[in-house]
């Protein structure tokens, strides 16, 4: 059976953008990469309850800009901006001699965000809710929010079974091989008493038409 390629990585440069936007020479590349990893882990751990979907990192000279996509921006910003200042001060200890700018972006439809759906299912599994119920409820909410299709997968000792297995549930269409298809992908882990359970979610949000077509239309109009 063929293995599934990461839907985001497959579409980078086609309809998706990089989550890290910076350039570095050989000497600094590894340091920047490790720094990015530490920043992402810290923000995710520190603001897990706020529902952080993804983090974009932009670098320029001695400045780092973070675009944090979250379902609950108020939880990160805090009262009078205290939360965001506290986060900035903590991050300043991770990155030395660099100014940090934090931009909070609200996720308008968290029910249709793959990463947030995966984390929600994982949280329910940790609360001992049946995995089938958790998956089906998430699928129903996603379809009501207006997505074209959704697929979920849970892997591990489901229901405390002796032998680990994987169960899939899906609704709508998920064209994984179509590059112009806007497929959102999320992964989370649930720590249960029987061990870890991996949760994967694919969400199809519709087709993104290539920009080249729009350019051709403009050329025809000008002719």
UniProtKB/Swiss-Prot annotation:
Keywords: Ribonucleoprotein, Ribosomal protein, RNA-binding, rRNA-binding. Residues 39-108 form the KH type-2 domain. GO terms for molecular function: mRNA binding; rRNA binding; structural constituent of ribosome. Gene3D superfamilies: 3.30.300.20, Ribosomal protein S3, C-terminal domain (3.30.1140.32). Binds the lower part of the 30S subunit head. Binds mRNA in the 70S ribosome, positioning it for translation. HAMAP family: Ribosomal_uS3_B. Belongs to the universal ribosomal protein uS3 family. This is Small ribosomal subunit protein uS3.
């Amino acid at each position: 059976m063929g293995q599934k390629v990461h839907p985001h990585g497959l579409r980078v440069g086609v309809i998706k953008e990089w989550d890290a936007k910076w350039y570095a020479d050989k000497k600094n590349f590894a340091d920047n990469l490790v720094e990015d990893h530490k920043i992402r882990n810290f923000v995710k751990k520190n603001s897990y309850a706020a529902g952080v979907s993804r983090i974009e990192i932009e670098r320029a000279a001695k400045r780092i800009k973070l675009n944090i996509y979250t379902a609950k921006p108020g939880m990160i910003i805090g009262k009078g901006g205290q939360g965001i200042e506290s986060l900035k001060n903590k991050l300043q200890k991770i990155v030395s001699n660099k100014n940090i700018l934090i931009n909070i972006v609200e996720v308008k439809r968290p029910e249709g965000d793959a990463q947030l759906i995966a984390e929600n299912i994982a949280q329910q599994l940790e609360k001992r809710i049946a995995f089938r119920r958790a998956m089906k409820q998430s699928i129903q909410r996603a379809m009501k929010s207006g997505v074209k299709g959704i697929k979920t997968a849970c892997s591990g000792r489901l229901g405390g079974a002796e032998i680990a297995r994987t169960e899939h549930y899906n609704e709508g269409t998920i064209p994984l091989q179509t590059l112009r298809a806007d497929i959102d992908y999320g992964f989370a882990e649930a720590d249960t008493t029987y061990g870890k359970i991996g949760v994967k979610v694919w969400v199809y949000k519709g087709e993104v038409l290539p920009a080249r077509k729009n350019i051709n239309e403009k050329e025809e109009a000008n002719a």
